[in-house]
């Protein structure tokens, strides 16, 4: 019974997502406050948080808020283009790193302390990164030419910002064009334009795009139903396994002496 109760409590803890849950992260605490504040703007800029030593390099993408179930960063893996750009950036060979990172809506690069002088010099030497600040917690660069999270590339050559939220975006398409989402391609992205579902397309850059044929209201959604369903199925399987492992409820006189000792 104790095992069953523990499993149920564990499942609730994971799904509810408290401050110490497996599906949340307090990674925003290590990002400078002004960068976290900028992440709340309609452009929803992201920050690449980099930790580099002489032997290892780790990174994650921060949106200024803790992660939770349903976020695109949880439901999908990190795009290989970003992994390659980070690898090239550290070695100083990433001439296109800023363009790649910027296309995925990453507007800032934060190198955490302790800062490796070699890594800092490598980033300074690569075009497209403008140093903004250097403090005891690390160094921040702005990525030149980075894209907002959601834009409408109009047919006249202009780009229009579509205000984004933590999950999707809602705004007005002032003219026909392509709505570009600065996220990894995933079939869970949905766009409704003037009440009509718009087919999802996969851009060569790896981004999800939608062709908007007429001006009007557009609503972008990330449908994580399948992802949540998979997690629920995994938890259900775990629960069944624990229940099957519990004592079968046999009478005491039917239990062998070896099991009672």
Whereabouts are the PLM-identified features?
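Extracytoplasmic
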Residues: 2-75, 166-176
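A generic structural motif
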Residues: 5, 69-80, 131-143
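Short acidic (Asp/Glu) and glycine-rich catalytic loops that position anionic groups and cofactors
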Residues: 8-19, 78-81, 131-133, 149-152
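Alpha-helical scaffolding within the catalytic cores
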Residues: 33-34, 94-95, 125-127
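Extracytoplasmic/lumenal acceptor-recognition loop(s) of multi-pass membrane glycoenzymes
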Residues: 38-107, 117, 147, 185-187, ...
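Aromatic/acidic, Gly/Pro-rich catalytic loop(s) in extracytoplasmic/lumenal soluble domains
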Residues: 106-160, 181
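Active-site-proximal, structured, solvent-exposed surfaces of multi-pass membrane proteins
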Residues: 136, 147-261
């Amino acid at each position: 019974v104790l095992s069953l109760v523990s499993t149920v409590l564990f499942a609730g803890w994971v799904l509810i997502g408290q401050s110490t849950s497996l599906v949340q992260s307090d990674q925003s605490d290590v990002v400078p406050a002004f960068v976290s504040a900028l992440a709340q703007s309609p452009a929803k800029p992201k920050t690449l948080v980099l930790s580099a030593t002489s032997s290892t390099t780790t990174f994650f993408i921060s949106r200024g808020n803790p992660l939770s179930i349903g976020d695109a960063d949880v439901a999908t893996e990190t795009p290989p283009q970003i992994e390659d750009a980070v690898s090239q950036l550290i070695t100083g060979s990433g001439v296109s790193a800023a363009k790649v990172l910027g296309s995925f809506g990453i507007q800032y690069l934060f190198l955490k302390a302790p800062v490796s002088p070699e890594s800092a010099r490598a980033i300074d030497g690569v075009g497209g990164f403008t140093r903004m600040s250097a403090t005891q917690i690390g160094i921040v660069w702005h990525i030149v030419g980075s894209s907002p999270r959601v834009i409408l590339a109009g047919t006249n050559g202009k780009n229009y910002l579509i205000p984004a939220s933590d999950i999707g975006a809602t705004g007005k398409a002032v003219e026909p064009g392509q709505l570009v989402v600065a996220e990894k391609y995933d079939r869970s992205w949905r766009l409704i334009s003037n009440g009509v579902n718009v087919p999802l397309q996969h851009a060569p850059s790896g981004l999800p795009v939608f062709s908007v044929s007429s001006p009007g209201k557009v609503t972008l959604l990330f449908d994580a139903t399948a992802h949540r369903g998979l997690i629920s199925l995994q938890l259900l399987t775990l629960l069944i396994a624990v229940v099957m492992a519990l004592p079968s409820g046999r009478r005491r006189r039917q239990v062998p002496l070896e099991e009672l000792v």
